[in-house]
Curated annotation (Swiss-Prot):
It holds the Pfam family Cg6151-P. It is a multi-pass membrane protein. This is Golgi apparatus membrane protein TVP18. Keywords: Glycoprotein, Golgi apparatus, Membrane, Transmembrane, Transmembrane helix. Golgi membrane protein involved in vesicular trafficking. The lineage of its organism: Eukaryota, Fungi, Dikarya, Ascomycota, Saccharomycotina. GO terms for cellular component: Golgi membrane. The keyword Transmembrane applies. The chain crosses the membrane at residues 31-51, 53-73, 97-114, 120-140. The gene is TVP18. Belongs to the TVP18 family.
Amino acid sequence: MALNISSVFSNLFAGFSSDFKKKNFSLYGQWIGLLTIFLCIALGIANIFHASVVIVFSIICIVQGLVVVFVEIPFLLKICPLTDKFTTFIRNFDENWPRCGFYILMGAIQWLSLTVQVTSLIVVAVFFTLAGICYALAAFMHQEYLKTSFNVAGEPDSLEGQVGDHIVRNVL
C-alpha cells in the first residue's frame, strides 16, 4: 500500500506545524473546528443517555458536528450527494466573519444546555467559542482567510503524493 499509517501521521503533523508557523488565526480556528467535530460527535453520543432535556442538546450537538464537517472539509461537498440549498448554505462560510458568527452561534446553543444541566457539553461550547474567537481575531487583524495546508498523501512531487492525487481524481 502506498499510503501507510506512519506516512499519514508524518504528513499530518508536518502540515500542522507549518500551519502554526504562519501565525494566522483563521488556521487556528480551522484546527479547533476540526477538533470540535470529534468532540461534538463523541460528547453528543455520551450525553444522549441522560433522562432529561439534555437529550435534545445532545442531538443538536451531533448535528452540529456533522454540519461542521462540511464547513471545515469543503472537499466533502463535492463527493457527497447533497442538496444545492445545503451546499450553497455551507459555501457562505468561506470568510472569517461568517465563520466567526457561525461558531459563536453554535457555541451559544451549547452554552444554553447549561441552563438545563451542567454536562460535558460545556467542552463543546468552549471549543466552539474558541474557534469563533480565532476567526474574529483573524477578521479584526485583517488576516487573509486561509485553509490548512496539510495533505495526508504527502507532497505533490513525491511518489506518495502522486498516488494520493490519483486516488482522489478517481473518486471525483
